[in-house]
Amino acid sequence: MKEIKDFEKIKIKIASPDQIRNWSYGEVKKSETINYRTLRPEKDGLFCERIFGTTKEWECYCGKFKSIRYKGIICDRCNVEVTHFKVRRERMGHIELAAPVAHIWYYKYIPSRIGLLLDITASSLNSILYYEKYVVIEPGDTDLKKMQLLNEDEYIEARERYGMSFNASMGAEAIKTLLENLDLDELSSKLRIQMIDKDDKTDKKLLRRLEIIENFKVSGNKPEWMIMEVLPVIPPEIRPMVQLDGGRFATSDLNDLYRRVINRNNRLRKLLLLNAPEIIVRNEKRMLQESVDSLFDNSHKRKVVKGSSSRPLKSLSDALKGKQGRFRQNLLGKRVDYSGRSVIVVGPELKLHQCGLPAKMALELFKPFVIRRLIESEAVFNIKRAKNLIEQEVDEVWQILDFVIKEHPILLNRAPTLHRLGIQAFEPVLVEGKAIKLHPLVCHAYNADFDGDQMAVHVPLTPSAQAESWALMLSTNNLLNPANGHPIVFPSQDIVLGLYYLTMEKKNIVGEGKKFLNFSNVILAINNRSLDYNASIYVKIDGEYKKTTAGRVIFNEALPKGIEFVNKTLSDLELQILISKVYVVHGSSTVIEMLDIIKELGFKYATKFGCTISMSDIIVPDEKKTYIDRANKEIAKIQNDYAKGVITGEERYNNVVSVWLKTNEELTNKMMEILKKDRDGFNVIYMMADSGARGSRNQIRQLAGMRGLMAKTSGDIIELPIISNFKEGLSVIEFFISTNGARKGLADTALKTADAGYLTRRLVDIAQDVVVRIEDCGTINGIKVETVKNGEEILESLKEKAVGSYSIERIKNPITGEIVLDANEEISEAKIELLEKIGIEKLVIRSVLTCEAEHGVCQKCYGRDFSKNKPVNIGEAVGIIAAQSIGQPGTQLTMRTFHIGGVAQAGSEDDKISLKNAFILNSIEGFNVNVDNGILFTRKGTLKIINVFYEEKIKNIKEIKVLDSQRVIKGIPLFVNKKGVEILSSYIGYAKLRDDKFLIVSEEQEVALKAGTKLEIGVGDYVESGKVIGTFDPFAEPIIAEVKGKIKFKDIILGTTLKEEINTETGNVEKRITDNVFESLDPRIFIIDSSGMEVASYVLPGDAYLQVEDGQNINIGDVIAKLSKGSEKTQDITGGLPRVNDLFETRIPKNLTEMAKVSGIVQFKSIQKGKRLINILDEYGVEHKHYIPAGKHLLVRDGDVVKAGDMLCDGRINPHDVLEILGGISLQEFLLAEIQDVYRKQGVSINDKHIGVIIKQMMKKVKIVAVGDTNFVYGQKVDKHTFYEQNRKVIEQGGEPAIASPILIGVTKTSLNIDSFISAASFQETTKVLTDASIAGKIDDLRGLKENVVIGHLIPTGTGMGLYKKIKVSENIDAKV
């Protein structure tokens, strides 16, 4: 039997008048609701029983028929059908309108749909509908034009002049006639011709008109249906009227709105019968139009209709819109029965899969199950008696409850549920009291603590729901974080401290240096008090004695069998690494066993350690005063430079901040060093921080070092630091400065949490229909991944980037030629290690970004599911997981400022350049000049170097086994030394013989240098690691003379382009180029040689400080002008979250850079309209124009050679430019890198594939640039797959395909343009989405998750996938056991 649920698609259309009459069970003629005496509905009123059905079950209105046996009979007296009262939720009525009215959605919303069809403006349309102007419908043979508007006087004049030879009218009747007369086919072809004539310049209005006309044609809707003759009346149960205690009635606002419509309609009908004067009728029609507008969308009107308490009435649209609307409040978020909530407390005695459930709560939740068992066990014979027993709480009830909850999982949820681990299943254990007990190790997944947090309990009822809870949601099946595959169930705080204490080593204590044959002897010695936990001992393990400690023996003895001996001090990170390792090697069951052991041990030894903290544990370094004095001296020097005018105010500020940051860092290092040595490393504060149990280096710095610099509310750093720490106590001024940061922290947290929540919501909306649908899409495209480095520091290894993905190409060992990795093979941890060993640093892998699956993604392109560490299953909702993985840390990061209490965090800039590895300088690129003792870079430059990994003097070598410049990989023989030992390589690189040394060096690498860098080494030099090779000014960018000569100013005019400011602090005159832009003036400096020739020209950007005078003689390398860097801002995620928002919304940055559109030679041209024209001459001699706002600091000079995509001036990159100039793949890489950068800076690890899923959705659409023989419109934005499908059909028929270019759309816009109108409507702009969908007659295929939740289907992922719906379970009787 087919149920109403068995449908696969939903279509939305505009209802025709006949359709509305068809739905209706009768016309509502009166505005009455119910009779005040009988409290029964009035006949023909808004609650009429004849129309909407009976209010009493199986009884007619007059009471003639009273029983289910008369079902379906219509009473001959009152005409009410004998039926179920629930029909009052389904039956609709209608109102026949005395005059047509326009639907507000189609005429008032911008762009006005009726206006677009008829090509009239919204204001003109309003004036027609509200009976202010006439519109000419048929001009006949007069001078009037069709669609011309006439006011009253013009109309009277035209009537006198032309008589009845033309037709003009007003109101919705006129618009209806115009819409009926439209020929859509003719209009469509006319507009298409206009579009082609316009060529490149797409007219948005034309495009919109064409789209709306095509939508009407395809959907079968008629334009005149946007004008209503019949108004549907929704069922009365949906707009109920209920009696309150005081005898008064509360009614839905809709009833008031309907009453206004009916009253006005009836009055209009009467006026028409009486042939009332036109002006009165017209006014009544206008009021009818207004009342219908209010009914459909009251909040959209300029004058809102208000109820008795002067509150705006809630119309039909308002019931759908917003957070409290039908979609978000009732369809997507429902209240759940069989649920409860209570405070949580810690349950250290629980196993990982258990939770403690208060007995009282359990009894209430499992009541029906208990009742059933009571009846089955014949303790009682009816439900009423069973309920009584339960209320009395007899012993039998508790026994049955124990039996019922055994192996019946319950779900625990903590709000806010930021990712899927916010709901997990546990087996309940009955506990006394009223609090839920939670296992301490799952707190991290819930982000729960025990300071009053509450949690909700839900009971899965059906066997299938219980099975899913056991198999998929049990806490022991959720050990890994879906965002990155790291363990999410790991010990913290007390447990960590206990294990750290247990596994630490201490000198000179009982039992030190003893030897033991086995573990049990060690434990015996400890129990006899002849051995201390932290004593260093020797134990026989696998046949040989190993140096370890007694505590480590206890730890290893407790671990499950088969785990390698752990011989180190365990901090929280070490424990996480151990858990990961055990998971990979031994699987989840061993990890679960191990986690409970770790928990027991941790709590036990934390208790035994019983650490306390006192003032004497906080040690302030004696060197503090020295450091502070030194900083003050440096600052005095900076102030002195500023007073002399050597540096600008901004540079002074930046330098001061930098000095304090450096001093604070040095002091902290010293403090940590002292704490580490204190009590042999057993200083409690140091132990807490070092183990990762509580507190951080940053917090200890404030206790024992100095509090440091604070941030202002604006994010600027206050240059006066707090020199005291909390042990010494703060002075009044220091305390005052502190309050600023502390308040900022709290305010930020509150505001940003909402922001991050909204980001998650948008991401979920855009990605909710991305599900793994097929095994392999068969693509041959992939993306290139390599190690992410910052200088020489590895930020993300190749392993992190590529593990769990599938390869695109086959990779062979460069030396043996054997296949290491085949195409389409999963890249496992072992494979990565093999690849790294043979020196492979770049890989091309399959990625969600290049997946060609029509809907969702395929298994191979997605790769590994990180929550299981296995290839992803078909049916996994990877879109939602991606959105949660990105949004969840967003919310976490907003909390960061809170804990440090507003202490400023910014990198202190170093003015010296040194590299970690030793290296050889191969070559120098970029403009540079020789100055005394070095090379000065006048513009940005690059050093090409090779790093030296290994060196050995040739005199120590007997025989070299490799050739010069030969590639070497790990494990191959390099040479035989003088002792005859063969030395194997532990590095990947190239062998190099240089002078008297044998080296292993890297491939050539680039080191970028800033303008103004002075280099102290030369080409070919061998430089030791850590040696300073050059210096630069980190806070200013200089413009440097590249030739010798005399300065000549051009367009530098005081008061116009030059501003002289007297510095009030120093009394010096500072000359600054203004930001004002003048067409004719282009401030620049020429250098003139001895013959009077101009040999160099330098453009001066706005805000540049001049360092020279007109006519001054200058040498090579002198600074002409300099630009100060903006003052340091504190970098916390408050900078980061808005950045992520901007990237996902693809907003154009404020301070925009201009990118070179092509590769070629730069040519400077004039300034036009405040913008400097720069041409780039490409290889074919074609000029490409670039306009850059004058006053911007240019990064190129006349004659420079640039590559496409190079930045021409400073500023932020616009992602849309990246797409246009460098293409889709570069854009994907750019967005991925930018978003990852924000999260990485905060130490948050998110796998690339999650961000990839979102970016893929943002690039789903293409823009048509050539129509060909398809039905597309020029400039239209269509889905990629729709585009390919249409083209395929056209090519098959021998036609010309369309051409499109890729576009990038932000997440909000993408969510609104999603294929499913139900999903889009439930996101934002509900009424707009539904308006457009109804015109287009859209069909929702119910592919995504949201639309299925809204209509009450199972979601089409996992066990709810279509694949599994048709599976029938058959019993095979003959099956052999």
Curated annotation (Swiss-Prot):
Free-text cofactor note: Binds 1 Mg(2+) ion per subunit.
Keywords: DNA-directed RNA polymerase, Magnesium, Metal-binding, Nucleotidyltransferase, Transcription, Transferase, Zinc
The organism's place on the tree of life at top rank: Bacteria
One family name in Pfam for this protein: RNA_pol_Rpb1_3
Binding-site residues for Zn(2+) 2, renumbered to this chain: C777, C851, C858, C861
UniProt key word Magnesium: yes
Catalytic activity: RNA(n) + a ribonucleoside 5'-triphosphate = RNA(n+1) + diphosphate
Cited InterPro entries: DNA-dir_RpoC_beta_prime, DNA-dir_RpoC_beta_prime_bact, RNA_pol_asu, RNA_pol_N, RNA_pol_Rpb1_1, RNA_pol_Rpb1_3, RNA_pol_Rpb1_3_sf, RNA_pol_Rpb1_4
Listed GO MF terms: DNA binding; DNA-directed RNA polymerase activity; magnesium ion binding; zinc ion binding
Function: DNA-dependent RNA polymerase catalyzes the transcription of DNA into RNA using the four ribonucleoside triphosphates as substrates.
UniProt family annotation: Belongs to the RNA polymerase beta' chain family.
Subunit structure: The RNAP catalytic core consists of 2 alpha, 1 beta, 1 beta' and 1 omega subunit. When a sigma factor is associated with the core the holoenzyme is formed, which can initiate transcription.
HAMAP family: RNApol_bact_RpoC (MF_01322)
Record's protein name: DNA-directed RNA polymerase subunit beta'
Source organism phylogeny: Bacteria, Pseudomonadati, Spirochaetota, Spirochaetia, Spirochaetales
